[in-house]
Amino acid sequence: MKRTMMMAAIVASHALAPTMAQAAAGDLLVAPTRLIMGANSGGEVVVNNTGDKATTYRISLVLRKMTEQGTIESVDEATASQRDAAALDLITYAPRKITLAPQQSQTVRIGVRVPPTMPGGEYRAHLLFRAVPDVADAAAPQPAADGMSISLTPIYGVTIPVIVRVGEPTGSASLNNARLSVQDGQAQLDVDLMRAGDRSVYGTLELMQADGKTPIATIKGIAAYPEVAQRHIMLPVDRTALARVSGPLKVRFVETDPAAGGAVSETAVARP
């Protein structure tokens, strides 16, 4: 007897910290890409179906952690520490399931309720927006040797961090071990973003002349969360743009998180 098994392949847009004002995967667009909220506050996220057919999206709150390479990994709620899982009890959201017509958008409301006894600090969970697959659109099953047919249906999803700050957590950023290299004809900047304190840092990384104002290369939306003391960043550099400028170079990290007050960290970097 031939059997058919439907398997879902989840394609989630959360591997790296977001670098745009909108996060997108498939026909799903979410804005903003991050929320920072205080105790007993509220916010909203706009979900937009950019496709040409009606789609249903499920919304859930999940745990994620950052690695020193900047990737975002899933955390099992059952094994998470009490401190890491605390945000799940602080954050509320509605609705939890929406159906959008083509080019239609809807607002998801986010709320925070912090108990008076909650210790100060930064707490974080991630909102996962995931398209519900249409069974009718599933790929035709491919027959296997044992007579079982398997069909893979991609499920597109986007995650955004929801950061809750209780009290006034502090944080600071600095740069270390900056170096430029050329491999296979491609220039690349490597640098370690160092983070201190109990608050995440977030901003823009720039390579520029030591006395200049125009960046040679830029990457926006760089975050380092409290679980990492440092994050390694790799920034591709256009060799033509690099050759057009002379003199010493520097790397600059400009914090765009309002809590940082526009703090700037700089370090020199030698030419390759």
Predicted features, each with a name:
Residues G26-D27, A54-I110:
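Surface-exposed binding patches on compact interaction domains or structured appendages
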Residues G38-E44, Q106-V108, P119-H126, G185-L189:
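Short, solvent-exposed loop/turn segments enriched in Ser/Thr/Gly
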Residues E44-N48, Q188-A196, P236:
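Short edge beta-strand/loop segments characteristic of extracellular beta-sandwich folds
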Residues A23-T55, S60-L61, K97, A173-D184:
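Beta-sheet-dominated interaction scaffolds and their linkers
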Residues K53-L61, Q69-I72, G121-E122, A173-S174, ...:
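Short, hydrophobic/aromatic beta-strand segments
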Residues R113-I163, A243-P272:
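Terminal connector regions
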Residues L63-A87, D134-A138, Q209-K220, P258-A260:
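Short aromatic-acidic-glycine turn motif
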Residues I98-S105, I222-R231, L242, P258-G261, ...:
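Short proline/glycine- and polar residue-rich coil/turn motifs
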